[in-house]
Each structure stands twice: as structure tokens, then as C-alpha cells.
Regions:
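Acidic, proline/glycine-enriched N-terminal capping motif
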Residues: 1-130, 196-197, 258, 267-269, ...
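Basic, nucleic-acid-binding surfaces and adjacent catalytic neighborhoods in DNA/RNA-processing proteins
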Residues: 16-46, 56, 63, 68-72, ...
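Short, mixed-charge, low-aromatic patches
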Residues: 99-103, 130-138, 157-164
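A short, charged helix-loop
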Residues: 115-155
Length: 276
């Protein structure tokens, strides 16, 4: 699943395709795959004239701005497990293209989503149930966590709370593993409140680790195609813990595999016994 770094790279890709270094690209039509009929995929009406497209990310969300003349319509998107954008010649779009933006120059920018967990909604801005972006709103992010430490959600182990998008918007499976691995003194099965109270570096890493992932070009994650030709080897060297056969791992209560330093195996067993 694409995480904070991959969402920002997706926004960069859309902006590069739509603006680049030359004249503004003109779009002429928006088309939704008729397979999407639910309320989770509300598509704007196709503008009657040429329109431009730009994008911005915040945590795990993306907003496309569809601008026709003086009118701008936001289109909020989540990528799901496999969603990404791809520019092709018109008529050569993937069979898994579920939202298409046709361009005057004979090309199409498509939202491709093999597993179809992605969703979008026209006219919507950022979700109110997601917290600030840890990288672009670092101060707001820290404040949001610290002011809510008395909430019951922080009774849970830190490895679970890091996946809570209300407080850690953009942190996903590989980022939580890398953040916690870089805190060797932190038991990942300890109560989140205690960890945050005693280890302020945790919140710092929630900012610096995603920034580093972004600067390295993001990952080529399972079921997700990176729109950029990033240096795969550099990113793989950056990933120390996630999906590493030498690390410990456990399925968390949300069904996601959590990777951790194996020195915490005993604490992991204690955690499992408490759940029974």
C-alpha cells in the first residue's frame, strides 16, 4: 500500500505530467470506469471546455484540482492498496484504469487500480478524520498527538497506534517498522502513551523517516507501481526492518504484518498472551 512518501511522489508525477517545464497541458474530458457505481467513487462532471489539473498530497490522501477558467473543483482520492497514475497514449490505457483524464495532445492520464480499493469524491477537501501531515505540518502533527495523549486509543501498543491515521496520517506498514527499528530502546509492544512520554524522538522520526523515503524516490511496493524510475537499490538499503527475513514479525489485530527487531520476541509473546 502506498504511504506518505509514495502519495507525495504521485502528486509530483501528476504535476509533472500536467505542467512540466513547458506550456500548460490542456485536458479535455474526464471518464469514470462504469464498474464503479458506489458512493465511494463520486466523479465530477466533465468540464465543457479545456481544463488544467494539479495535485497535492497530505499524509495518505491526494487531492486533484480540476481548474476550468475561474472555477476549481477538488477531487479527493485515496490510493487503496494498488492505486497509481500512469500517462499513456489514448487508447492504450490499462484495463485496470478506473478514472481517465483525456488530454488534447492525444494522451491520457489514468488512475490505475488493480485491486480496486481506491476511492474518490468530487467537491471534497481533506478528510476531517485524518491528522496533520507529519512532514509538511510537523508542528501541528506533534501538537495533535500530544494534546490527545489522554485518549484511550493511546492505551494500545505503539505499533498499533502508529497506524492510526487520525494521529499518524501517512504512516503505514513499512514506515512504522522503520521508525520503531531506529529506536532500539523502545519496546514496540509497550503502551503508546508511555513510549511517547519517554521518547520524544519517536515523533521526530515520524517526520524524518518519511522525508527520507520521499527523497530516495519511494518504494516499489507490492501491487503498487512507482510512477518514477527511482534508484531501487538506494531505497532497499534504507529499508532495514520491513519484510526482512531476519526480523521478527506478527500479524497485528488489524490483519497487517508488523516487522520488528527480534530482540523483542519475548515481549511479543507477552503481548499475545494478554490478548487471549
Amino acid at each position: 500500500m502506498p504511504e506518505l512518501a509514495e502519495l507525495r511522489l504521485t502528486a509530483d508525477y501528476i504535476n509533472e505530467c500536467s505542467q512540466g517545464k513547458g506550456p500548460m497541458i490542456h485536458y479535455i474530458k474526464i471518464e469514470k470506469n462504469p464498474a464503479h457505481k458506489g458512493t465511494h467513487c463520486i466523479t465530477p462532471e466533465s468540464p465543457k471546455d479545456y481544463f488544467s489539473l494539479s495535485a497535492e498530497s497530505r499524509g495518505k490522501e491526494l487531492i486533484l484540482y480540476i481548474k476550468e477558467g475561474d472555477k476549481t473543483t477538488p477531487l479527493r482520492m485515496s490510493m487503496g492498496m494498488s492505486g497509481h497514475f500512469k500517462l499513456t497514449n489514448t487508447g492504450q490505457e490499462s484495463k485496470h484504469a478506473h478514472l481517465k483524464f483525456y488530454r488534447k495532445d492525444g494522451t491520457t492520464l489514468s488512475f490505475v487500480d488493480v485491486r480496486r480499493f481506491g476511492k474518490w469524491k468530487a467537491g471534497e477537501t481533506w478528510s476531517t478524520n485524518r491528522g496533520p501531515d507529519p512532514t509538511t505540518e510537523a508542528d501541528e502533527f506533534k501538537y495533535n498527538v500530544l494534546k490527545n495523549l489522554d485518549k484511550r486509543v493511546f492505551d494500545q501498543p505503539i505499533h498499533l497506534v502508529l497506524m492510526n491515521q487520525k494521529y499518524f496520517n501517512g504512516i503505514g506498514n513499512y514506515l512504522r517498522a522503520e521508525i520503531l527499528y531506529r529506536l532500539p530502546e523502545v519496546n514496540p509492544f509497550m503502551e503508546a502513551r508511555e513510549v511517547i512520554d519517554n521518547c520524544p524522538m519517536l515523533l521526530e522520526l515520524c517526520t524524518t523517516i518519511p522525508r527520507k523515503a520521499y527523497s530516495l524516490g519511494g518504494g516499489q511496493l507490492k501491487d503498487w507501481e512507482n510512477p518514477w524510475q527511482s534508484d531501487k537499490e538506494k531505497f532497499e538499503r534504507f529499508i532495514k526492518c520491513y519484510n526482512n527475513k531476519n526480523m521478527g514479525h506478527i500479524m497485528d489485530k488489524n490483519g497487517r504484518r508488523f516487522w520488528f527487531d527480534p530482540k523483542w520476541n519475548i515481549k511479543m509473546l507477552e503481548h499475545i498472551s494478554k490478548q487471549k
